[in-house]
Amino acid sequence: MAGSSGNTNETVQATETSFELLDRIRDTNGSTLSELADYLDLAKSTTHRHLLTLENLEYVVREGNEYYLALRFLKLGESAQSR
């Protein structure tokens, strides 16, 4: 798995996995399910569940076979910037 850091004994693995997916989608400007599953060395079914959750929460959008970051991140960025 790519880029884990910190004390993993005190973290939630599913949250780390979702953020690794988001980082990879950002870095590649869109990725397919297969590409993401291969990159994180996860089963496609596991990767799909993460992506479906992120899609339902409007953090990613799917266009055809590709997943992209959604505009919801702009709201988070605006909030962080105005702090």
Regions found by a protein language model. Name each.
Residues 2-81:
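N-terminal helix-turn-helix
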